[in-house]
Amino acid sequence: MLLSDSHIHTMFSSDSEENPVNVVNNAISLGFKHICFTDHNDFDAPLEDGKVMFDLDFQEYIKYFQNLKESYKDKINIHIGVEQGLMRSVADRVNSYDSAKQLDFIIGSSHLVYGEDPYYPEFWEKCSAKDAVLTYYESILDNLGCCHNFDVYGHLDYIARYIPANSYSYNWHDFNDLIYIILKTIIEKGKGIEI
């Protein structure tokens, strides 16, 4: 069995403090042959306490992981990737990101719903939770129509983790037709789907 992980966040992401060296050593101890670091980059993510979030310092990131890759080349294959937030309002930046092709892998994900973050409780106050989830899936289809620079679409049901308790019991069948169109669109674009 080939063990690998291609969705890893580290201290380069606003939501992690993990040291990449620890990740590499753990992967080696587990017998992994390949890993791919995919720290977050979300253009125009909402500020948190006045701080810019999920804005990757690309050059520093590439330099760090190229050095790490070289240091461990005889023990494990390290790939450099990114989890890129997809959104119509930043499609030009998404589509031109990594124009020098320094990345091995890009996960495209919809973390924001037309610029709003479902992580925050205020997101859920504007309409019913079920309608908010519907809007999320509609935004994914919109994002897929304009953002093309990714290899695999990440965590399609991302929003489910943030649905407020006792508001709506998530069931993907409620959005079956729309999810079918989303999956068909991803496949027609020749992209993979993260499971």
Where on the chain are the PLM-derived regions?
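An N-terminally biased module of ancient metal coordination in phosphate/nucleic-acid-related enzymes
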Residues: 1-91, 97-98, 160-176, 181
